[in-house]
Amino acid sequence: MNSICQPSQLPHGAYAFDQFKTEDFREAFRLAIEEKRREVEAIIASPEAPTFANTILALERSGALLEWVSGSFYNLLHAEATDELMQISQEVSPSLSALSSFITLSEPLFERIRQVWEARESLQLDAEDLRLLERCYEGFSESGAQLPAEEKERLREVKRELSELSLTFGQNNLKDQQRFRLFVDDAAAVEGLPLSTLAVARELAEKEGKGEGWLFTLSAPSYFPFMQHCPSSTLRQEMYLAKMAVGAAGDAYDNRELIRRLVNLRLELAQLLGSKSFAEKVLTRRMAGSTTAVYGLLDELLEAYKPLAEKELAAVADFAREAGATLPLQPWDWSYWAERYKQAFYELDEEELRPYFELSRVSDAIFSLATRLYGIRFTECTDLPVYHSDVHTYEVHDADGSYLGLLYTDFFPREGKQSGAWMNNLQEQYHTAEGEDHRPHIVLVMNFTQPTADRPALLTPGEVRTFLHEFGHSLHGMLSTCRHGSLSGTNVVRDFVELPSQLMENWLDEREWLQSFAVHYQTGEALPEVLMERMERARHFLAGYAACRQLSFGYLDMAWHTITEPLAEGLDTKTFEDTAWQKAQLLPATPAPCQMSTSFGHIFSGGYAAGYYGYKWAEVLDADAFAAFQEEGIFSTATAERFRREVLSQGDRRDAEELYQSFRGKKATIDALLRRDGIER
């Protein structure tokens, strides 16, 4: 029997990763796609009059095997990719796209849905069932089910091409980034780099037979410390240009023409469905609602932050000039001199803080924070199979002892693992046909600095913040109480989904929480008062620059997705990018072919197309939401319970704005965010 499709015999229905055979995914997808199609065909062919149960609910519950296969496959594809997995993903992409089009473009299926929708007032549905019906009807009515046959066929082809191109973009990024190596054998050139970074680089050099020296890569734990601490501007330039040329090297992994095709196809899809631009189509179902609202927020924040950012840039540049640097500072010089400035004026070196943030203690502290706020508890299980030896598994239970779900953690970079950090649902939360509450299985994936032979994994405060962020997403999934999987957990509009994650980041800035766990991994000494004071003084360091950087990404995303005419062949993506984000840029432009767009996975392969602004949108929400904790106590269980009840448990049961105001009692404004970043209006 197929190793992927076998029903789980493990506790909680966990995946038997140790039994999976990669080659079995081909057949597993074939079987799962066929099963889903048969289930949908049965709904369409039903001789019974359409009802909520035989149409909407039946459609919601269809495809269980496909959900099972996809949940494991796409996690492995991102966290443990092999050439065979990537090949399989390319092979199954057209079949998945065809299945999606078969469903969403089916006129008889849409007709059944429409009849149920029009009868909704007489059906006596509860609020969640009505929400499912609403989402189902909206989704089909906006997906082209009523288009003429010729336009439907074109829409099928567009969706198929988009699926394949998005997949190729991500795989090009992974392969291009992972092939780069920078070997350094001059000790003076790496003087000042963190010992942990050097130890990993030394081990990699030995592993790859480079001899005495250090081997650096573009993975975050290697790249960012290198850019902050390498004293050689020449080597920093080499590293930076390599990073910014990912997907733009003019070879098999070049993404430039692929970007043009992607955005043109997205435009065509939107216009087939009646919108002027892809952004217009996407934003009608977001909190923002329109491109006008998105640009309004971006412009309002830019007006508030850019003057501060320009002052920050001038201060760092003056400091660098006095230290002998050549002005203007180039992009590859910025991180290095900003770090020197922080050390000089705030007496704060993030590497000095690493020993106080040993990963296992940080993990325990974050779990304990969730216990303190929400009453939930984490118990490690060592008897469940995992897909890599780095992965740990935890059972999560509520305060009353009831089971909430499984949490997998995967912390370290390795070959075949994408860069960055993310949370995935391996299995969604939902109620089965028998009424059983199927609890979620969630994975947190990071790329933290690895342990070495003589040191455990030690984190910077920035890495702790990343952990908190992704853990916030996991809480959103873990605490869901929905009956319908498509509404549960993180299945909310994109500009709301970052609220729970970004809210969790706030506790890193709270002394009371830091004091509960931050001790030196060797001596047990508590994080010294002087270091906490320095962290607090530096809290707003480069707040303006960081905000403008994020805003520039938002402008770039919107520029790609507000086009109303196709982009011509031969498009210079570098020039397009430079124009799109110019007003939010502070440093000199990088030389061609270097650019952000060709590796901008969030918008070209990660689901954030016309949605990157959502990080700033949610930042406004999270600052305003955390103000409630500050008003009532940062460990207030009453406030936490209200957030759990009104936001974390709700999924997409109600509109995001309604959920937020149910928690906060008012609309959010940017005032709390500006105060948090030290800006008074």
Predicted regions and their residues:
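Short, hydrophobic/amphipathic alpha-helical patches that form generic packing surfaces
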Residues: 64-75, 138, 241, 335-342, ...
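C-terminal, non-catalytic "cap/extension" segments appended to globular domains
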Residues: 1-20, 27, 31, 213-214, ...
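Short, well-ordered alpha-helical packing segments
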Residues: 26, 30-33, 37-40, 56, ...
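Active-site-proximal, well-structured secondary-structure segments within enzyme catalytic domains
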Residues: 128, 132-133, 161-164, 171, ...
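N-terminal helix-rich structural modules
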Residues: 1-193, 629
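Short pre-active-site segment immediately N-terminal to the catalytic Zn-binding motif
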Residues: 449-468
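Intrinsically disordered or highly flexible coil/loop and linker segments, enriched in small
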Residues: 34, 38, 42-49, 65-82, ...
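Short His/Asp/Glu-rich catalytic/ion-coordination signatures at enzyme active sites or charged loops
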Residues: 9-24, 73-92, 115-157, 217-257, ...
